[in-house]
From Swiss-Prot:
PROSITE patterns: WD_REPEATS_2, WD_REPEATS_REGION, ZINC_FINGER_C2H2_1. It is found in: Nucleus, Nucleolus; Nucleus speckle. It comes from Homo sapiens (Human). Residues 139-148, 322-338, 412-423, 461-493, 608-620, 888-906, 958-976, 1278-1291, 1299-1312, 1333-1346, 1457-1481, 1502-1513 have a biased composition (Polar residues). CDD domains: WD40 (cd00200). This is Zinc finger protein 106. Phosphorylated by FYN in vitro.
Length: 1883
């Protein structure tokens, strides 16, 4: 895309508002719009015509003489040098160019945008404006003065070589950034310079055309040429599309010349036209820069140099708009519409309809049908005429280049006038330089109205496309001229190649003009060039056609055109269709991308080979199999031609590529692109290299642009803008031009239709027929226009077979996309690209609707392959299928090029479809396909299509499970590398393109280009029709194509019909496969997303399950006989679940293996088809596996939860696609350790019953399902280990709540087991596996659970069934609590999978917290099934509570709560959850949660002791349970509290930190050293088992202590008081009183960064979270706001508002941020959206601590109360008092609430949601968890110690006390009795 150059406009002197001088009219207009209007005015046009006539007369003669003498010699020399230097240049420049094109592209992208609205301005901004300015000064002055660009170019030989040098160098320089254009133009101000340039440039041109821009420059006979080469390189350097730009320059030059020719044709005065055009060109060149000017002097030269400088500039900057403009103008002139018919479709606003482009394109295609070269030239002439007609406008816009060119022509009019041929060729060449400038010329001429004002905005892409096609044509023509003039044999390929693009442009612009121009060219070439016999023959043919078409064109031009045309004809004879299509594609490419333009130039230079490639590619398109044969033929024929050595190499490569390419269609595209690229490589490897680089970077950016405008003809220019590989561009150009042509000629419209049909996804048969029809039509058009029997015969002969198969092979190549009948077809066309698209893209949107259509499209496009492909699952990846079919043919071809081609092809399609349907399914599919292709390409560099197909399938399969995120990531990374995609689709397409480039990087540059070009072709096709047009529209276009089909031979129609039938069959299969694959991929994608949600939901569900479990435990505790009563209590719920579970388990027993699939299908659908479906599948499979192995592991019941973990592991294994494998392994190991004694079967049973239990529990649990599924998804997403942990947690959580949670069924089953294990200890009966299935409506669940935990339960029963259950629950809950510490990034003891005991619980909890924080369940899950679930639960707890909070609306949570008796569940759960919450500070103390649950349960009963024993076992290092009571020692306010390693760490305002034993509550250590109050502390694991204590103080320091030695290891000095500390990701975050957050590396305590967050207000609290891959830092502040920032750089993402006072505390759970504030409320915000979700009220003072435990939230308040809220219902469940002062800090560990008060007191209170003591005092509704707290409340809050009279307000009590009676004691006793006797609430 010309943007590269424009990025750095040569100087600020060319803003759009700069005054532009029309040299023709002598008028100066201010602003591009005014200038464009002037240019488009009739007066200016008349003047231009007159001047052109003069210039034609002079310039052609001069040019002819020039070409005949010096130019021919220089061309020959340059050709030799070019061929010699091409490889080195290609390599060198490819390297540099690849880089430059990318940044250039990027730079130009903005400029392109500018171009879009002011491309003329752009052009003018560059040299064009200068040209305009300098037009008045005269051509020489213009060159000298007009180019600030010139001045840029002025630096060094490129700038100053003199016109020959400057032109050569200036040209490249001009493009370069116009940096040298001034100098170059200045030095080359004279005609002599022009002549010099002419020679130097011609030779340059030759080598450029042949070898590439750089080689051309390097091969310049002039020293300047090397400078020019350097400038070309610089140009390349300067532009991302540099590589393309040289080609583009060439193409531009050719186009300009062609445009000049067209203009002459338009004028019907070849010489006059040339002169007028040259004048315009000079003016425009003057305006544009010396490039155009020096181009003027010698066409080949001009085109070469102009392309490098002016052309390239225009290519990137002006070229976009100008080429578009030219195309538009040419088209407008020809059809009265803008040449942007195709472009119009993408850019409807284009001032000029795209009919012209359509006409041109159709003409081109028709001409192409007859003879690619002949047609191309006439077409280009038509474009030129069109441009000439439009050029009056465009020329004004382009006037600077045109004027400059004219000036140069005038300046170099000596040369120009020296001979008509020289003049003509110079005109042509100059027009080629003007190709960008001709467009510019057109722009100046019509710029005011057409290009400058109107097109600039919309024309950025449309114009770029249009102009680019023209530019390509011009470039091509220029290339033709210079090669033709310089050396006939050498130039033949160049001429043909140049001509090919030129023809393509003409095709897009106007076949007739092209023909006329071609005649002129032929004449010029004949007179100016020594044509080889073949060339002469071609010339004759061309002359015949040209004379027929455009006898007006000057003889010299005619000769030149003829020579070029002859070459084209020669190779066209071999593969005229291919050449045409390739040229067309080339046209597109060079138009679309500077790099492509350069490629085109390169390819033009190597037109023989390139044309052959085109022919072969086109032929291949027509009939894929025959295409290969014919391509080989064409290649061989081309190889026979003068430039054939390179062509042969490339052809053989292409043939090999064909063999390797997935299918003939792909082969065609690939081969075409490969041939072009190879020709470029050999002839101008520099250019091809540039093309590669530019393609990579520019291609993507341009891709987007192209996508936008690709559907219409203007797409061609856009394609070149896009910087697609030359072959891709050709294909795209063909497609686009076909689209554009639709309006002009029936066959041409058919071409457009065919292209669009590919995109449209019309019937492949129709497409094939259309394409075949198009080809015959094209042949007819070509024949009619170029009356060259040779061409016709050649085309017919070469493509006859292919026509029989699918006559218009090039067309079919184009059709490859159109072949796709549906969007699916388009995808199929892209096959692999589609797969990549599917992988990374929007599977949800794409999967179903797009998949069938896409698949069909694919099949259609790859008709020959489709038959083989139909069976393939991913038939829509027809590329792969085609590869299979064509594999025999393609076996010879290197798979590298095939891969490159495939990936590029996919990229092309992707690009096409991406733009119109960025979010469309097809884009998604294509993106995935492209990604897959990339992978395939990279992986299968030498493999065949079938492996690629399999890879694609595998990728799809993988994508189904993992790909949504993975593919997206890969695509994103690809897209990021390309930096091209603006939208997701664009990104995908671009990424695929980048991948294509990357993949093809292993292949030769040419191959890469070809591959990309292939993609482009497809994509162009797909884009043209599918993205922009609905399938119906595409079908209509296809109908248009049908018209061409009708014209096409009967065999083509028959072949198409057969192919269509094959494709339709394969399409059906593919559609089914696509649907399946997309469904799988979509499911996987959704699953990944949902898994994240599931993770949260599972957390919530786990909390809910805990609540259920708590309810069960409550029942157990209430009856104290946990066995039967608890079973019955929770059994009501659980029995139904059990029934379903038993049924499920029976089913599982019956169908252990099948059940997994069953689960996959029905359970997935039942629970959560997408996210949990996969997870469920995994879980289910383990369940069955476990089921099979259940009998073995039933020995260890202790680890009920562990069996869940193994199941989870199995689930994980089933989920491995979701990256659960690692986790599952860990879980399995840990589970095996833990579950060696634990029967897995019960777990399985639980699971099996789970689906049904889910159903039974479905209503309440469905929401749970979602949460569980989401959590599951999250866990999976987080990491394999996290997934396993998540699964286990899901299992636990899902046990009860996730009955509707099939995704986490394994988890649910284990959770059910856990919960039921706790609730079904009484259910000893259901022990036998047989019993389970049968017994259990109720028992099944219980038995499944109990079996898993039977022995465990029995053991616990022995200890005390209740206790056993409690510990289990508490363990699970502890795990849940552990989840809470997730914030902490310590996975310290999580990996202690072996420990199932309480110690393990603690450690695992801590580790799990850390794990969950890290999202790495690690071996914590393996520690115990319980632990894994628990940590997950903890995550769930935190997440659950959070998710509950964040998802207050989530019914699953609410339902779970409601269904599970919210209060009891909450109470029991609260115990567990609170433990998790406590573990917020430390993971380990969260491990105590199970204890707390047990304690909660045991509080009522004496189970406490048994629970303690079990807990003792589960707590490492702590044999005893933490005890309630107070901790003495602090003398001032306790500011922070944390539990770590079963130790309580507290910091105080007394400047000390104390460590207490949780059991003895004794102070075991004091940390001193701070000189001021210690505000915060943090104990964290550092390395290994080492832990460090960080304390933040008001003395502006953070002290780091060794926990064991209690020595201060390091003191970190800070800028202000340290108010809060937080650690995660091995980073310590410190919030300061000045509003900043300072980060330290925990490993070495080195300061990392300082984030300015809330200054000057202090930071009060910190938290962390994750948003996808982004790490979030949440900062609470005294300014009443919470800021969510990027944890890496502190970038503010969003602000959470709502609090009216200082934020004092925060807790992040899942996606919710719970914040407590001094405004006496707790707010829950969605961290991702910033939305305030909930508000919890009821506090009477500032909320100092917020802790989330599963489904409950525990808050500490300055009103001395700890409150327990239900997250979902906002209900206050409990209140804990007993404090004498304000609560400053709180943590929860093992169901113990540890609070620090302002008076320095610390106390531990057991959190027991099962015990509720209601204050029935009148007007009081507090429910206390401890009787003593109620008593204190009654005595302190409801009674006045100094009461005189006291009336007992207890409900139903009327006792009255008076102080007189001394009844105060009685009153107190009375009230206490109320509290003891009447307050108990049955929970």
């Amino acid at each position: 895309m010309p943007v590269g150059r424009i990025e750095c406009p040569s100087s600020p002197s060319f803003p759009r508002d700069i005054s532009h001088e029309c040299r023709v009219c002598g008028v100066t207009e201010v602003g591009l719009s005014a200038y464009a209007k002037h240019i488009s005015g009739q007066l200016h046009k008349d003047n231009v015509d007159a001047q052109e006539r003069e210039d034609d007369g002079k310039g052609e003669e001069e040019e002819e003489d020039y070409f005949d003498k010096e130019l021919i010699q220089l061309i020959k020399q340059r050709k030799e040098q070019s061929r010699q230097d091409e490889p080195s240049n290609s390599n060198q420049e490819i390297n540099s160019d690849d880089r430059r094109p990318q940044w250039r592209r990027e730079d130009r992208i903005p400029y392109q945008d500018r171009e879009s609205y002011s491309q003329p301005a752009w052009h003018h901004r560059g040299p064009p404006q200068r040209d305009w300015k300098w037009e008045k000064d005269g051509f020489n002055n213009t060159r000298k003065n007009s180019f600030p660009h010139s001045l840029r170019n002025g630096g060094g030989p490129r700038g100053r070589s003199g016109w020959h040098k400057g032109v050569a160098g200036g040209s490249s320089t001009w493009f370069h950034n116009h940096s040298n254009s001034g100098g170059g133009w200045l030095s080359n101000s004279g005609a002599v310079d022009w002549n010099h340039n002419g020679t130097g440039r011609n030779s340059s041109w030759l080598s450029e055309g042949t070898g590439g821009f750089s080689s051309w420059h390097m091969n310049n006979s002039n020293g300047n040429w090397k400078s020019s080469v350097r400038s070309t390189n610089n140009w390349n350097y300067s532009g991302p599309g540099d590589k393309f730009q040289p080609g583009r320059n060439r193409n531009s030059n050719c186009q300009m010349e062609d445009m000049t020719m067209l203009w002459n044709k338009k004028s019907n005065k070849s010489n006059k036209y040339s002169h007028d055009r040259y004048n315009w060109q000079r003016q425009e060149n003057d305006k544009l820069g010396t490039v155009a000017t020096y181009r003027g002097p010698s066409e080949g030269f001009t085109s070469d140099k102009f392309p490098s400088e002016g052309l390239l500039d225009f290519n990137f900057e002006q070229l976009e708009s100008q080429t578009t403009k030219q195309a538009d103008t040419a088209t407008s002139k020809v059809s009265g519409k803008n040449g942007s018919a195709a472009r119009e479709k993408p850019r409807r606003w284009t001032p000029y309809p795209s009919q012209k482009t359509l006409d041109l394109q159709s003409g081109l295609k028709d001409i192409t049908g007859n003879k690619s070269e002949m047609i191309e030239k006439p077409l280009f002439d038509f474009s030129l005429i069109t441009t000439g007609i439009q050029e009056p406008q465009t020329d004004e816009t382009r006037n600077s280049p045109t004027q400059k060119t004219q000036k140069e022509i005038h300046t170099g009019s000596l040369n120009h006038k020296a001979s008509s041929d020289s003049a003509a060729s110079f005109e042509v060449v100059r027009q080629c330089p003007t190709a960008e400038k001709p467009e510019q010329e057109h722009t100046p001429n019509k710029m005011p109205s057409l290009k400058s004002p109107l097109l600039p905005c919309p024309a950025t892409k449309s114009l770029s496309q249009k102009q680019d096609p023209k530019n390509i044509s011009k470039n091509t023509k220029t290339n033709f001229f210079s090669p033709g003039e310089h050396s006939n044999p050498s130039n033949k390929p160049t001429v043909e190649d140049n001509h090919g693009p030129y023809i393509s442009k003409l095709r897009s612009s106007c076949p007739h003009v092209l023909k006329g121009n071609k005649s002129t060219f032929g004449s010029q070439k004949q007179s100016g060039d020594n044509l080889n016999d073949t060339l002469r023959k071609a010339k004759e043919v061309l002359q015949c056609h040209e004379s027929l078409q455009n006898p007006l064109l000057s003889t010299s031009k005619s000769t030149r055109n003829y020579a070029k045309a002859s070459r084209n004809v020669e190779e066209s004879e071999k593969g005229s269709l291919k050449i045409e299509f390739q040229v067309h594609a080339l046209e597109d490419e060079s138009d679309g991308e500077t790099s492509d333009t350069e490629k085109h130039g390169t390819k033009i230079g190597t037109l023989g080979s390139a044309t052959t490639e085109l022919l072969s590619g086109s032929t291949r398109t027509a009939d894929e199999k025959e295409e290969d044969d014919r391509i080989l033929k064409t290649s061989r024929e081309l190889s026979t031609s003068p430039c054939n050595p390179i062509v042969r190499q490339k052809e053989s490569e292409l043939q090999m590529t064909s063999a390797a390419s997935p299918h003939p269609g792909l082969l065609l595209d690939l081969k075409t692109s490969l041939e072009d690229a190879q020709v470029d490589d050999s002839i101008k490897s520099h250019v091809s290299y540039e093309t590669e680089g530019f393609e990579s970077a520019s291609l993507d950016a341009e891709l987007q642009k192209s996508d936008i405008s690709q559907p219409s003809g203007p797409l061609l220019p856009e394609l070149s803008k896009l910087g697609f590989p030359a072959s891709l561009q050709r294909d795209l150009t063909r497609h686009i031009s076909l689209k554009s042509k639709t309006g002009v000629h029936l066959p041409e419209p058919n071409l457009n239709s065919a292209r669009r049909i590919r995109n449209i996804s019309g019937h492949r048969k129709s497409e094939t027929e259309k394409e075949s029809g198009l080809k015959p039509t094209l042949r007819q058009i070509l024949n009619a226009s170029r009356r060259n029997v040779n061409w016709e015969q050649v085309i017919q002969q070469v493509t006859k077979k292919k026509q029989e198969l699918g006559k218009g092979l090039p067309r079919f190549g184009i059709e490859m996309v159109p072949l796709v009948q549906n969007e699916q077809e388009a995808l199929d066309l892209d096959g692999e690209p589609d797969l990549s698209s599917l992988e990374g893209f929007q599977w949800e949107g794409v999967s179903i609707s797009s998949s069938p259509g896409l698949a069909r499209k694919r099949s259609l496009s790859e008709s020959s392959v489709i038959m083989d492909r139909a069976p393939s699952v991913y038939s829509f990846f027809s590329e792969e299928g085609t590869g299979k079919e064509n594999e025999p043919q393609q076996m010879v071809s290197p798979s590298n090029s095939l891969r490159a081609g495939q990936s590029q092809k996919a990229t092309m399609h992707l690009k096409q479809e991406v733009t119109p349907r960025a979010a469309s399914l097809r884009t998604g599919e294509r993106a995935e396909n492209v990604a897959t292709q990339r992978r395939h390409s990279a992986q299968l560099s030498s493999d065949h299509i079938i492996p690629l197909m399999h890879l694609a399938k595998d990728l799809n399969s993988q994508e189904r499970s993992i790909p949504p995120s993975e593919n997206q990531n890969s695509q994103e990374s690809n897209g990021e590398g390309n930096c091209l995609s603006s939208s997701a689709s664009s990104a995908l397409a671009i990424s695929s393109l980048a991948d294509a480039a990357t993949d093809s990087s292993c292949t030769s540059g040419a191959e890469q280009n070809d591959g990309q070009s292939i993609r482009k072709k497809r994509r162009a096709t797909g884009d043209g029709s599918s993205p922009e047009l609905p399938s119906l529209e595409r079908k209509n276009k296809r109908r248009k194509i049908k018209g061409k089909k009708e014209r096409s031979q009967v065999d083509q129609l028959l072949n198409i019909s057969l192919r269509e039938e094959e494709l339709s069959k394969s399409l059906q299969c593919m559609d089914n496969n696509l649907l399946q694959a997309r469904a799988a991929l979509q499911t996987a994608y959704v699953e990944v997303q949902r898994l994240l949600m599931l993770k949260q939901q599972i957390t919530m569900e786990m909390s809910a399950l805990r609540t259920h479990r708590i309810q069960i435990l409550q029942g157990l505790q209430e009856t104290y006989e946990p066995s039967e009563h608890p079973d019955q209590v929770p059994c009501s719920l659980t029995r139904e679940r059990r029934n379903s579970r038993s049924q499920t388990s029976i089913d599982a027993a019956l169908l252990p293996t099948p059940f997994f699939p069953l689960f996959l299908e029905p359970p997935s659908s039942h629970v959560s088809p997408s996210p949990t479906g996969a997870s469920l599948q995994i879980t289910t499979s383990p369940t069955f596996q476990t089921h099979g192995s259940v009998p073995a592991p039933d020995s260890s019941v202790q680890i009920k939860q562990e069996p869940m973990s193994p199941e989870q592991d199995e689930n994980v294994n089933a989920v491995p696609p979701s990256s659960a494998c690692n986790v599952s392994k860990e879980l399995l190991e840990a589970n095996r350790e833990i579950s060696d004694s634990c029967p897995v079967y019960p777990v399985i049973t639980a699971r099996l019953s789970l689906p049904e239990s889910t159903e039974s529990f479905h209503e309440p649990s469905q929401e749970l399902k979602f949460s569980v599924e989401q959590r599951n998804t999250r866990n999976r997403e987080n990491s394999p280990s996290s997934q396993s942990a998540g699964l286990s947690s899901i299992n636990k959580e899902g046990e009860e709540p996730t009955k509707g949670n099939s995704g986490s069924e394994a988890c649910t089953s284990s959770f059910l087991r856990l919960s039921f294990a706790s609730e079904t200890p009484l259910e000893k009966e259901p022990h036998s596996p047989a019993d389970q299935p049968e017994q259990q409506a109720e028992s099944t669940l219980t038995s499944a659970e109990t079996r898993g935990s039977k022995k465990k339960k029995k053991l616990r029963k022995k200890k005390s069934l209740r206790a056993a259950h409690v510990p289990e629950n508490s363990d699970t809950e502890q795990d849940v609590l552990t989840v809470k510490p997730v914030r902490k990034v310590k996975a310290g003891k999580l990996i202690k999978g072996g420990k199932v005991t309480t110690s393990t619980w603690e450690d695992s909890r801590t580790g799990r917290e850390q794990e969950s924080v890290r999202d790495e369940p690690d071996s914590d899950s393996s520690l115990e099934v319980l632990e894994i679930p628990n940590p997950q639960l903890e995550v769930v707890a935190i997440d659950s509570s959070e998710s509950g909070e964040e998802k207050p609306d989530s019914p699953s949570k609410k339902d779970i709560w409601n269904s599970t008796e919210q209060n009891p569940l909450e109470t029991s759960r609260s115990g567990c959850d609170e433990v998790s919450s406590t573990s917020e500070i430390g993971t380990r103390y969260k491990d105590g949660i199970p204890v707390s649950v047990a304690e909660t349960q045991t509080v009522i009963s004496s189970i406490k002791g048994s629970k303690n024993s079990s807990e003792i076992s589960s707590e490492p290092g702590d044999d005893d349970e933490p005890t309630e009571g107070s901790f003495e020692g602090h003398q001032a306010a306790v500011n922070a509290i944390q539990i770590f390693g079963n130790l309580l760490y507290t910091c105080s305002a007394d400047k000390t930190v104390r460590v207490y034993n949780l059991v003895s509550r004794k102070c075991i250590g004091v940390f001193e050293g701070h000189t001021s109050k210690v505000n915060c502390l943090l104990v964290t694991q550092t390395s290994g088992k080492n832990a460090a204590l960080y304390t933040g103080s008001s003395d502006h320091t953070i002290r780091c202590y060794n926990v064991k030695s209690r020595e201060c290891v390091e003191q970190l000095q800070l800028e202000d008081r340290v108010l809060c500390l937080h650690s995660r990701w091995r980073i310590l975050y410190a919030g300061l009183a000045n509003g900043t957050v300072v980060t330290f590396n925990i490993k070495n305590n080195k300061r990392l960064e300082i984030f300015e967050c809330h200054g000057p207000r202090a930071v009060s609290c910190l938290a962390t979270a994750q948003e996808g891959a982004r790490k979030l830092l949440v900062v609470g502040s005294y300014d009443c706001t919470i800021s969510v920032r990027d944890a890496r750089n502190g970038l503010l993402l969003r602000t959470l508002e709502g609090h009216s006072k200082t934020i004092l505390c925060m807790k992040v759970v899942n996606d919710l941020v719970f914040s407590g504030s001094s405004d006496q409320s707790v707010h829950a915000h969605n961290i991702h959206t910033g939305e305030l979700v909930r508000i919890y009220k009821g506090h009477n003072h500032a909320v100092t601590v917020v802790n989330i435990l599963g489904k409950v939230m525990v808050t500490a308040c300055l009103d001395k109360f700890v409150r327990v809220y239900e997250l979902q219902s906002h209900d206050r469940l409990q209140v804990y008092g007993g404090h004498k002062d304000m609560i400053m800090c709180m943590t929860i560990h093992k169901s113990m609430i540890y609070t620090g008060c302002y008076d320095g007191s610390i106390q531990a209170v057991r959190l027991n949601l099962m015990q509720n003591y209601r204050c029935w005092w009148h007007g009081c509704s507090l429910i206390f968890g401890v009787v003593d707290h109620l008593k204190q409340h009654l005595l302190t809050d409801h009674t006045n110690p100094n009461f005189q009279t006291l009336k007992c307000r207890w409900k139903n009590c009327d006792a009255f006390f008076t102080a007189r009676k001394g009844s105060k004691q009685d009153a107190a006793g009375h009230i206490e009795r109320h509290a003891e006797d009447d307050s108990k609430i049955d929970s």
